[in-house]
A protein has these predicted regions:
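Catalytic machinery of carbohydrate-active enzymes
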Residues: 1-333
Length: 333
């Protein structure tokens, strides 16, 4: 079967999960850019060894007019069918296109690499610019693992991370197979919903995830993973407390698997967040309040997001009787 993906990179990793279980394999995976995502063809060389090393892959190619049996990237144009995860969003679309009755959940490891022993004992940290959670206790994580932590990601991510949470060295890799091998060889992966996190999930490696309140769609019920959305975390030396005095006010519906909503400002996650912030129950700065209330649908805080989303969120909060205590919305636009 010929399957295309236009990315992002994390999408490709979860498509691999589906191909690892899909009948009538091995399959051909084809990259093509479609203008809706960040462009994935440029990563072909970096992905090649990782993808072709998987036993369920027959061939890995760039698009050049080949027959396409399933354009997996088209999941973005369809309504999500109550997914538990990003993988479920892909497969809900794939089942319809392929007229398949298979139940694919990504419960087992689907990435197979040789662990890099050079990273034995290491803790790998990653934090991309999207899908963040300001309740995640990064400062405490860095303190806990500083002597053996390394950061993976682009230069801008590393610089920002060190400025915010303290210095940790950054490691670069010539291809994504080597990155996956480093994660597999490490003791633990800690990160947000990034490409590195997708690799870690494909390996089913020990992990702590910084869960996005806006798009919590990378949750998998396994015993060696922690999902932190309110500051609570189990570290080797101690347990960190919830940063919200009344956790019941954030209604995440975090029963695994399933139950998450994708309804923007009408979701219980947003309503609970408004209440917690307005009641001053959360130990956050004014800047963090702004970031939470002005995040765009993609989880990024940009000027255009403030212009569009902040006034709408404030209006929603006022209608709900919640005071966000932001004196002048125009000052942020």
């Amino acid at each position: 079967m010929n399957v295309t993906t236009a990315g992002d990179l994390g999408d490709l990793i979860f498509v691999l999960s589906i191909l690892s279980e899909l009948d009538n394999g091995p399959h051909t995976l084809i990259l093509r850019d479609n203008g809706r995502t960040h462009g994935i063809e440029k990563h072909f060389k970096s992905l090649h060894k990782l993808v072709t090393s998987q036993p369920y892959i027959k061939s890995f190619e760039l698009f050049n007019g080949q027959r396409i049996d399933w354009a997996s990237e088209d999941f973005r144009t369809r309504a999500r069918a109550e997914p538990r995860s990003l993988l479920d969003s892909h497969w809900a679309h794939g089942k319809r296109v392929l007229n398949s009755a298979q139940d694919i959940r990504g419960d087992k490891a689907w990435l197979h690499v040789t662990p890099d022993k050079a990273f034995n004992g290491r803790v790998i940290l990653a934090r991309s610019h999207r899908y963040r959670n300001d309740f995640f206790p990064w400062v405490e994580v860095v303190k806990e693992f500083r002597d053996r932590a390394v950061f993976v990601g682009i230069d801008a991510e590393h610089t920002e991370f060190c400025n915010l949470f303290g210095y940790v060295p950054c490691v670069e890799f010539s291809d994504f197979y080597k990155l996956a091998a480093a994660i597999a060889g490490s003791d633990l992966f800690v990160g947000n919903q990034s490409f590195s996190n997708a690799l870690n999930e494909g390996l089913k490696h020990n992990s702590i995830q910084e869960v996005s309140h806006q798009f919590p769609d990378c949750l998998y019920n396994r015993p060696n993973a922690q999902y932190c959305f309110d500051g609570r975390l189990r570290l080797p030396s101690r347990n960190l407390p919830c940063l919200i005095v009344d956790p019941s006010k954030i209604q995440t519906n975090a029963r695994l698997p399933g139950g998450w909503e994708y309804d923007g400002v009408t979701a219980p996650t947003f309503r609970g967040l408004f209440a917690a912030l307005s009641d001053h129950q959360v130990r956050v700065t004014e800047e963090q309040v702004l970031r939470h209330t002005a995040q765009s649908r993609c989880g990024l805080f940009y000027k255009y997001a403030a212009k569009d989303w902040l006034p709408r969120l404030v209006a929603y909060a006022e209608k709900a009787g919640v005071n966000l205590d932001i004196p002048d919305v125009s000052s942020y636009t």
